[in-house]
Regions:
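Conserved N-terminal structural module of periplasmic/extracytoplasmic solute-binding proteins
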Residues: 2-16, 20-108, 123, 286-289, ...
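Extracytoplasmic/periplasmic substrate-recognition and gating elements
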Residues: 63, 165, 237, 241-247, ...
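A structural signal for short loop-to-beta-strand junctions that line the ligand-binding cleft
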Residues: 88, 96-98, 126-161, 191, ...
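Hinge/lid segment of periplasmic solute-binding proteins
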Residues: 104-152, 203-206, 292-296, 362-366, ...
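Long, aromatic- and glycine/proline-rich binding clefts that accommodate carbohydrate-like moieties
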Residues: 132, 136-137, 295-298, 345-395
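Extracytoplasmic/periplasmic solute-binding protein
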Residues: 144-148, 153, 174-226, 240, ...
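Conserved C-terminal helix/tail region of periplasmic/extracytoplasmic solute-binding proteins
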Residues: 163-164, 185, 375-426
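Glycine-centered hinge/linker elements that transmit conformational signals in sensory
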Residues: 180-182, 186, 224-253, 300
Length: 426
């Protein structure tokens, strides 16, 4: 599974040049060249593949295209570190990276800076994909990246433990914490709730979901910061008070996706906010999960009712400085195809972008969360659509982490964040 720091927010940043190709995938520097031409070896640059299936997909391509082989270059699990390395490669105009597996929030930034090329819409089955995911690959209505996986936050919960105390899946934060209190009292050593609370993109996602789920906005539709409000404070207080009263364990403040997944699979959590990829791993029957068959998923809870997820996912784009762009386009077509998306869903439980897969009876039976996930993606909120997204995200992380750590109050953290965001969104 690729790191998600996988998303209720979108991005806003940029265009293109291209390349005539030779037979090697390159590694030297050089400016952007020509059109979508050139066939030969290419690279796929991606975050750490914790799903274990990406190489299988690439192997399938390589077997059928021995003269156009794809080499996977894995970057760190941390999304911010991934972006940093991709940006460094782009700013040096290196041709070492061909196809970039971009978090949806980076598409606009890379397009605006002319680090990725515009792609021909007619070459891809965009009408078969979830419309919300297609929009994440566009910049000023032009296609720069193709969505291969989507994401929406889900609430994983221990169904067996809730059943034992007569609790139902919660729709509000109060219901979730009330159920926790009953379960934890009967199961010493089990913690109530965790998400992605380390200071990285995942915290931006979790903070934004909390604010949105309280009825607020981080950045409004007019592009203006909107965090110094009662609703935003209610969202942040949900996280801050959870830490204070122990319902969010202290160590959970260091969790990214994988740390939380391991804790949930070890039976340490009652509730876990996580992406769809966790489902297959947590339900594994090979002895790696202590909760297989004991959990279920539900929509994220909110302050007064069901909450709002952040729109996540990954898009494939082509570096402006790469060689063999024609091969890159053909490889993206292969990866976005229904056959590959179906196989990836069945192997990893990652959310597909191919809309029809969410309604197939056999898949819904195997992955009961698909119906709710589709609704989550369709209703998910984008991340702040601002040009300086990375700076905005860093400011959000600093404010949320400092409040959750008890270094500052929610009110002061949000007042300071409002000032910073106003400067960044001018």
């Amino acid at each position: 599974m690729l790191s998600r720091g996988n998303a209720a927010l979108a991005a806003a940043f940029v265009l293109v040049l291209s390349a005539c190709g030779t037979e090697d995938s390159g590694g030297s520097g050089g400016g952007a060249t020509g059109g979508l031409e050139g066939t030969g070896a290419i690279t796929l640059v991606t975050g750490k593949d914790t799903s274990g299936n990406l190489q299988n997909q690439v192997d399938g391509w390589n077997s059928a295209h021995p003269n156009e082989k794809v080499t996977v270059i894995e970057l760190p699990e941390d999304a911010d570190a991934q972006r940093q390395q991709m940006v460094q490669n782009a700013t040096t105009k290196s041709d070492a990276y061909t196809v970039l597996n971009l978090d949806v929030i980076w598409t606009a930034e890379f397009a605006a800076n002319q680090w990725i090329v515009e792609l021909p819409e007619k070459d891809f089955p965009l009408d078969k994909l979830l419309p919300a995911t297609v929009e994440t690959g566009k910049y000023f209505k032009k296609l720069y990246a193709v969505p291969t996986t989507s994401d929406g936050g889900l609430l994983y919960y221990r169904k067996d433990l809730l059943d034992a105390v007569g609790a139902k899946p919660p729709t509000t934060w109060a219901e979730m914490y009330a159920a926790c209190d009953k379960v934890v009292a009967a199961n010493p050593g089990v913690s109530c709730y965790a998400g992605q609370f380390e200071k990285y993109e995942g915290l931006t996602v979790n903070f934004s979901e909390a604010v949105n789920s309280a009825g607020g906005d981080v950045v409004g539709d007019d592009g203006k910061a909107n965090v110094n409000t009662d609703k935003a404070k209610a969202g942040l207080d949900f996280l801050v008070n959870g830490v204070k009263d122990g319902r969010i364990a202290a160590k959970a403040r260091t969790f990214k996706e994988e740390e939380g997944r391991r804790a949930f699979q070890a039976g340490e959590l009652v509730f876990h906010r996580q992406w769809p990829y966790q489902y297959a791993k947590a339900n594994a029957t090979d002895g790696s999960s202590q909760v297989a068959g004991k959990f279920a998923v539900a929509p994220l809870p909110g302050m007064d009712g069901p909450g709002s997820s952040t729109l996540g996912g990954h898009n494939f784009a082509v570096s402006s400085f790469a060689k063999n762009k024609k091969t890159a386009v053909e490889f993206i077509k292969y990866m976005v195809d229904e056959k590959q998306q179906r196989a990836n869903l069945e192997k990893t439980s990652q959310a597909p972008t191919w809309a029809a897969l969410y309604d197939e009876a056999d898949l819904v039976q195997k992955f009961p969360y698909l119906t709710e996930l589709k609704k989550s993606i369709e209703k998910a909120k984008k991340r702040p659509a601002v040009v300086k997204y990375q700076e905005v995200s860093s400011a959000i992380q600093e404010a949320a982490y400092s409040a959750m750590s008890g270094q500052t109050s929610s009110a002061d953290a949000l007042a300071s964040l409002q000032t910073k965001l106003e400067q960044l969104t001018k």
